[in-house]
Amino acid sequence: MVTRPLVLGAVAYDAKVVTIWEGFRRYFLARDLPFDFVLYSHYERQVEALVGGQIDVAWNSPLAWVRTRRLAPLARAVAMRDTDRDLTSVVVVRADSPVRTPAELAGRAVGTGAVDSPQGTLLPLALLADTPVEVRRFEVGVGLHGDHVGGERDAARALAAGAVEAACMLDANHLLFSKEGTLPPGGTRVVAVTPHFDHCNFSVVADHDALDRFVTLLLAMDYADPATRPLMDLEGLTAWLPGRTDGYDQLEAAVDRFGFYGPAGEVAAAGYRP
Amino acid sequence: MDGHPPGTAEVDLGPLGLDGGGHLLVARALAPLPPGGRLRVTGSDGHLGVHLQAWARRRGHGVEGTTVVRGAADRQRLAGAVRAGEPGAVAGRADATWGLAARGALVEAGAPPLAGADLDERAVVWTELAPKLYAQAAAGQWDPATAIDWDPPALPGEVEAAVVQVMTYLVENEQAALAVPARFLGRIHPHFREVVQFLATQVADEARHVEVFTRRALLCGGELGISGAGGRASLQTLLDEPDWPTASFLLSALGEGTFLSLLSFLERRAPDPVTARIARLALQDEARHVAFAMGHLGEHLRAAPGLRSRLRAAVLRRHDALASTAGLADSVDDALVVLAAGAFTPAAIGAGWRRVRQLEVEMDEARRRRLVRLGFADAEATELSALHTRNFM
Ligand SMILES: [Fe+2]
Ligand SMILES: [Fe+2]
């Protein structure tokens, strides 16, 4: 009997996604794993397809994982990138700002990424949840759960221009914006850092004959192999690791706090139109 | 050594941040550590902790506070890397996976192989003369704006018209001499750097020749001359030749070789100093082009004597293809006579005529000499020289 191909869903947040999954598909097919992929325009559609059984695995954002687990409590995270573990986000002000603590941002404008960005919006804003700040969201790539860096970059630009008092962003993006000059090097100061959190994972809700083989092959992908290294570089990792789910508690709490999803996974955020 | 336990180290960045180049110091300190080795990073930059974990994570290193736990990704990246030959030696065959890398560079595996550079064998493209001839070419580049005194000469109308006709002919030949090496340039594996560099100078030389001959043609304000169909048919057969040694043989050993005689004749017989000067300058360049072709064809023929029959067949094929064409247009032949005569008297024209016939004898002798140097027997050299295109190039 021919095994039904394992079908993976991914969100097309950038044209390179096609290159990546075409390449991974070749990698799996060459190792006798029947494998197909389907691209989605945003994460909500992908999560619904996963829960509805149209795909077997979803390459999920952390927020998509949170919703998947609410819709399907038995969902599992089977693998993730080494670069998906132990991230932080920061709230930064200009170096000469009078603001020294998060509480001093009360009544001031804070720039964030898109409404659905974990690292650019939900997680850093949770640090300020008890402070009445004026949130200024930079909505780039809504529905992509922050995969598009544009919202965070626009918030950084607004900070540099003095249009907001503080801006929220991923640690790596703060480094990137400082190096590329979007933020003046040494011209900003961190006033709050989130605890470590985890990012994307491969989520499954139902079993598939080939799932173990998929995970085994994924974890066997070798950064020393010149045939797969370019794909790993494109996808931004040096090794695949087993999935773990204890790095999402912060985001679960933020989702509840801001009412982004309801307890049963319904989309509840006001004005969120992916 | 530094008082650190084995496999650990420490680096102080002072005030330098990772957004200001600090990662170079961190990477340098990590490099000698084994995977799993620990590097304590200190410094006063306010973003050190935040940036260090972001930088390290992306490169496969772990981070505990401000201690980096060395990963292996940088070593894995170069696991299958090979050297693209040696900087001072030319390989027998250049690998497509070396791509455009400098000769001797450490080539990270994984990029697509170099496409289109099918001329990758030393025996086919290389000559020991290439480095020296390239150096000569680089040193011998001249500026048409300053190397020539462009004062318009005042020649009799018919003599000026003859000069213009010869220039018109030269320009289209120079265009062919530019296009042929240009077409092969991209097909030669860049491992044979000096060959590629030499051909690039050859193309640039021909570009200057096109310029100066055009400029001389227009110098006195007249119209350009005739481009004969037979001449262009002859040049087209050069452009059509897909085989590098054959194209180089037909263009440079035979065609440009014949042009050495022609340009020398123009220098000696020119009725005005501008024509003499530009013929002289082009002649120096052409001598290099011929020397290069003789060099690589000679080495190639020693390695593969069977090539000789291929070259012979190409001359016969070209001759047959051009049998029904006129070869050198009457207009060009006549113009050479008038140019060499310098005046329209019977005595001058008669002298010009004899000089051009003598030129053709010199061309034939020089071609035969080159063919013999390439290992053709005397009789074969005589036969092939006679079959060379009447268009000279
Ligand atoms: Fe030339
Ligand atoms: Fe030439």
Where are these regions (language model features)?
Chain A
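Short, hydrophobic alpha-helical packing/hinge segments within bilobed ligand-binding/sensory domains
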Residues: 45-49, 151-158, 164
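Periplasmic-binding protein-like
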Residues: 2-10, 81-93, 145-146, 180-218, ...
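Conserved functional loop/turn residues at catalytic and ligand-binding sites
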Residues: 54, 109, 163
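Bilobed "Venus flytrap"/periplasmic-binding protein-like clamshell domains
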Residues: 5-31, 40, 63, 87-155, ...
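A ligand-binding cleft/hinge motif common to bilobed small-molecule-binding domains
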Residues: 59-72, 129, 157-186
